[in-house]
Amino acid sequence: MPRKLRDLPEEGEIVMATVERVEDHGAFVTLDEYPGVDGYIHISEVASGWVKNIRDYVKEGQKVVAKVIRVNPKRKYANLSLRKVTDHQRKEKLKEWKREQRAEKLLEMAAEELGKDLDEAYEEAGYKLIEEYGSLYDALERAAAEEGPEPLLKAGVPEEWAEKLAELAIENIEPGRVKIEAYVDLTCPAPNGVEIIREALEKIEEFQQGDVKMEVQYVGAPRYRITVDAPDYRTAEKMVRKAAQAAIDHVEEHGGEGEFHREIEEG
């Protein structure tokens, strides 16, 4: 089953669980993404309102989407709620789960071709991809979009894994729309510097056209975040750099300075 980087879930996290046993007062479950972690759903957390028969809502072997309300690290145990999960959260979690299952299958296929098992696959490649991109699927989708192993190599994955995973991703994953973020620093000492910077930001937004969406947000002087939503990574990367350069050119024409950052260091 798809795995997470952490050993335990966090409070408030939406998780996938399998119902192992149902009793009158609640249901005992295992957390699918966290091996060795058990959970409990009290009858009061099964549904809104009065629940006469808990078995009308959950059954042994059933997969459920739940919200973590408490975690006991020593016992590796979590208290969960079904009623606190919104319809949107449930839909998104199921979508994520199906994608991660698909991605893990590709990871397993790569492992078999390289003479490794799934545990080795996660240790040598999987966890690195999750850390870099948030999920296995997002990492493989990016490799499919860029038609090569570069995004996987960037995450520190060994070349043999990157090549094999990229090959499988290109064959099996149809890239969807992508969203990326980049940053631009803009300063202008001119008397009308604020107006110059405002015009520069408008230059960025002018690159929003057709199926490319562009958004600019103030982060903190002198930095602005540019978010691009595009059909594929190549388009997104191309447009964010063009837009940032247009803004930088504008402030430099008026005696200011600008600098583009594809990524920024945390902390």
Swiss-Prot record:
As one GO molecular function, the record gives:
RNA binding
Task: Enumerate the Pfam families for this protein.
Answer: EIF_2_alpha, S1
Arranged from A to Z, the UniProt key words for this protein are: Initiation factor, Protein biosynthesis, RNA-binding
- Cell inner membrane found in the keyword field: no
- Sequence ranges assigned to domain S1 motif in this UniProt record: 12-83
PROSITE patterns hit by this protein: S1
Membrane-spanning residues: none
Q: What family is reported?
A: Belongs to the eIF-2-alpha family.
PANTHER family linked:
EUKARYOTIC TRANSLATION INITIATION FACTOR 2 SUBUNIT 1
- Subunit composition? Heterotrimer composed of an alpha, a beta and a gamma chain.
The record's function comment reads: eIF-2 functions in the early steps of protein synthesis by forming a ternary complex with GTP and initiator tRNA.
Q: What is this protein called?
A: Translation initiation factor 2 subunit alpha
Encoding gene (name): eif2a
